[in-house]
Amino acid sequence: MKSTFRPALVIFAMLTLICGVIYPYAITGIGKLVFPGQAEGSLVTQNGAAVGSSLIGQAFTSPQYFWGRPSATGPMPNNASASGGSNLGPTNPALLDAVKGRIDALKAADPGNTAAVPVDLVTASGSGLDPEISVAAAYYQMPRVARERKMAVEEVKAMIDRISQPQYMGFFGENRVNVLTLNLALDQR
């Protein structure tokens, strides 16, 4: 027993030092050196202060802002420490009720808008924290935002088109808009 205890303790201490201290600090240092913005959380700053992350959705509720996808994190929306989908199946009555409620809220915010509501405005992403919406979802909200900000719809559309990003590698996903970036651009205009 004594002959195996000392080597086991030494191996335990060495692996703890290597895997628990040296490796994490080395990878963090390399990450900060090679990808400084991403290693710090992809923070978006305005006037020297962090206003959000380009990777985590935020809950915009004012009608003068574009709204992102619903958050599936609970009990607080857009809580990065509680990331995950709702795990509700497509026939689950709770999901159907939530989607109907979100559709009703969108229609109440812009009663004159008769267009079909884009699916990404009423369903949460797999992480529950998606910072982006489809261009179609931005166009759907465009009349409300333009009216609330007393802007021409064409001006808001031009802003959406300028900020939108194409499909990843030309064919993955769809064209998308980062909601935080778009709302900050609206505030700076």
From Swiss-Prot:
What protein is this chain from? Potassium-transporting ATPase KdpC subunit
Which organism does this sequence originate in?
Janthinobacterium sp. (strain Marseille) (Minibacterium massiliensis)
What GO cellular-component annotations does this UniProt entry give?
plasma membrane
Q: Which Pfam families match?
A: KdpC
Could you tell me which InterPro entries the record lists for this protein?
KdpC (IPR003820)
Keyword terms: ATP-binding, Cell inner membrane, Cell membrane, Ion transport, Membrane, Nucleotide-binding, Potassium, Potassium transport, Transmembrane, Transmembrane helix, Transport
Where does this protein chiefly localize? membrane
- State the family it belongs to: Belongs to the KdpC family.
Question: What domain of life does the native source organism fall in?
Answer: Bacteria
Q: How does it sit in the membrane?
A: Single-pass membrane protein
Compartment annotation: Cell inner membrane
UniProt gene name: kdpC
UniProt subunit comment: The system is composed of three essential subunits: KdpA, KdpB and KdpC.
**Task of the protein:** Part of the high-affinity ATP-driven potassium transport (or Kdp) system, which catalyzes the hydrolysis of ATP coupled with the electrogenic transport of potassium into the cytoplasm. This subunit acts as a catalytic chaperone that increases the ATP-binding affinity of the ATP-hydrolyzing subunit KdpB by the formation of a transient KdpB/KdpC/ATP ternary complex.
Q: Which residues cross the membrane?
A: 10-30
- Gene Ontology MF term list: ATP binding; P-type potassium transmembrane transporter activity
Taxonomic classification, please?
A: Bacteria, Pseudomonadati, Pseudomonadota, Betaproteobacteria, Burkholderiales
